[in-house]
Amino acid sequence: PIAVHEAPAARTWFGDARLPTVYQWHYDSFVEMPAGAQWLASSPACAHQTFALGIHLAMQFHIEITPDKMADWLAEPGNVYPDAIARYPDSVQPPEAMRAATARHQADSEALADVIYSAWRARWRG
């Protein structure tokens, strides 16, 4: 899971979600946020999971994941999963675990995606 911060901007983007489980696969990340960015969420694997900058949202996780997308990603020729699993076992799961978790968390992921996408669309109506 990621820890959604208590900032008003975090509530705007994430609604009532506090510790949502999201698809994250980390072995690389940025260390500093842009000037003026609002830090919205973090996790042990990635300190800067999400930030907002003006009307924009930056996420280092996937809310668009589905079992079919996961299957496509895992079937990609030359994929880097075996090396990443060996080098980053705390934040990169084996394919079997990714498939099972995707199916288990699909409904919650779709609900969170609806909240985030609705907040994003509201910025363009404005």
PLM region spans:
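Pocket-forming structural segment of enzyme catalytic cores
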Residues: 1-69
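Acyltransferase
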Residues: 68-126
